[in-house]
Amino acid sequence: MPADEIDEKILNYLKKQQWPATSEDVAKAINVQWHTAQIHLMKLMAEEKVKFRRVGRQNQWWLNKIYDKHMK
């Protein structure tokens, strides 16, 4: 699957979520390996398209607008 397609699938998945999704949740939803999802999520974070928060052992991800709505 091309990288742009993975990014688009991740963003579409996160748009549907009202609460944070873990890297594992994202990977399962778009049918890729955990580390593939993690790499793309980190890239999207660097592009300021998603926000990241570590809670215990989980990496949690939101779209920026959903994060701002719940965390401010």
Place the predicted regions along the sequence by residue.
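Short, cationic-aromatic polyanion-contact patches
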Residues: M1-D7, T22, R54-K72
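Short amphipathic alpha-helical interface segments
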Residues: I6-W19
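A short acidic, leucine-rich amphipathic alpha-helix
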Residues: D25-A27
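Key DNA-contact positions within bacterial/archaeal DNA-binding proteins
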Residues: H35
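Short, hydrophobic-biased segments on the C-terminal half of alpha helices
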Residues: L41-M42
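A short, conserved structural fragment
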Residues: M45-V55
